[in-house]
Amino acid sequence: MGPCSRLFVCFLLWGSTELCSPQPFWDDETERFRPSKPPAVMVECQEAQLVVTVDKDLFGTGKLIRPADLTLGPDNCEPLASADTDGVVRFAVGLHECGNILQVTDNALVYSTFLLHNPRPAGNLSILRTNRAEVPIECHYPRQGNVSSWAIQPTWVPFRTTVFSEEKLVFSLRLMEENWSAEKMTPTFQLGDRAHLQAQVHTGSHVPLRLFVDHCVASLTPDWSTSPYHTIVDFHGCLVDGLTDASSAFKAPRPRPEILQFTVDVFRFANDSRNMIYITCHLKVTPVDRVPDQLNKACSFSKSSNRWSPVEGPTDICRCCSKGRCGISGRSMRLSHREGRPVPRSRRHVTEEADVTVGPLIFLRKMNDRGVEGPTSSPPLVMLGLGLATVMTLTLAAIVLGLTGRLRAASHPVCPVSASQ
């Protein structure tokens, strides 16, 4: 571009000094390494608050804004008091103050707000020299981890896992098919069948845990403190239902530490016509590297060997099942049927144990069991039987009369009349 052309462009772009000023042929090293100017708005996301620092030269034009024209968030929080000589304006607010919005994502907690510059006329003037501006602000905090800058003392598991242990443990008790491959779709049984139960805890990101069935009770309603009731598991994991004529037992080995499977021979309560039961179990967990003991065990009774045996752990932890005293009395969640309410247990985390219920289990009577119930046939069945017998009698009578008429007709034949011989 020649001098004339350059001068012509300068007139068109009057005030564009960058284009019209002469450019040196050398490279100024001091300009290259000069530190860049800090941003006009800086945000510091602290543990419990956010600190916003605003340069009074917000627009970079050299014209300073007034602190009174700045607010933070939907609640229009005002800045901290500062001297007129300060070159910055500061805000310091809590994460849940000033109308800050919290959003929860898969990996982070996001607190969002905005810085508002809303200029107002100064004095009696009705003019503005700066524009209205809104600057969005966000603070991201990871959901997994410690946001404090102070060192933490480790608990029995890492800090991150302790939080999960209080939020992510989900206990369940389900009816399973005989081969344990899937959940049983229909809760119907016949007396003499065997119910396959699977207790499980979903640990999420927790450290590995081992699940135990501490206590189980069968009742006619989901309220396991009502009568009648039948104890299936007692004494911190002793499957006492196997002591009777039943073959109830825990399945060994486990498929996984967080799963415990066991079978119960189905039954119904005598002198009750509902033919259904609910099973409520108290489940709890321990770290998987903890050796089972008398308070945390799964023991079954073998009639062939006449002794108790654990699913895992030392054999002697099941000896207390025969005595009915395992560990310190009152430590387990046991039902006080006299008082009709559960006895509370002292525990460190509420979510390390839970009460879960499955049911109703519905029992269908077998066809050959009707005669065993005694002479209690219902009147509709009697009337139906009499009606069928009457119909069959009338049908046989009609058949006999029809055959008799045909035999008489055959003994006296009628000859057809011929037109001519």
Curated annotation (Swiss-Prot):
Q: What's the main place this protein lives?
A: membrane
Give the matching InterPro entries: ZP-C, ZP-C_dom, ZP-N, ZP_chr, ZP_dom, ZP_dom_CS
- What's a single GO MF annotation on this record? acrosin binding
The chain's Cytoplasmic topological domains, given as residue ranges, are 403-421
Recite the UniProt keywords alphabetically.
Answer: Cell membrane, Cleavage on pair of basic residues, Disulfide bond, Extracellular matrix, Fertilization, Glycoprotein, Membrane, Pyrrolidone carboxylic acid, Receptor, Secreted, Signal, Transmembrane, Transmembrane helix
How is this protein positioned relative to the membrane?
Answer: Single-pass type I membrane protein
Q: Name one Pfam family in it.
A: Zona_pellucida
Known glycosylation sites:
N124, N146, T155, T161, T162, N179, N271
Disulfide bond sites? C45-C139, C77-C98, C216-C281, C238-C299
Topological domain, Extracellular: which ranges?
23-381
**What Gene Ontology cellular-component terms does the record carry?**
collagen-containing extracellular matrix; egg coat; extracellular matrix; extracellular space; plasma membrane; protein-containing complex
Q: Which residues carry this modification: Pyrrolidone carboxylic acid?
A: Q23
Look up the signal peptide feature and give its range: 1-22
Function according to Swiss-Prot or TrEMBL: Component of the zona pellucida, an extracellular matrix surrounding oocytes which mediates sperm binding, induction of the acrosome reaction and prevents post-fertilization polyspermy. The zona pellucida is composed of 3 to 4 glycoproteins, ZP1, ZP2, ZP3, and ZP4. ZP3 is essential for sperm binding and zona matrix formation.
Q: What is known of its domains?
A: The ZP domain is involved in the polymerization of the ZP proteins to form the zona pellucida.
Name of the protein in question: Zona pellucida sperm-binding protein 3
What organism is this sequence from? Bos taurus (Bovine)
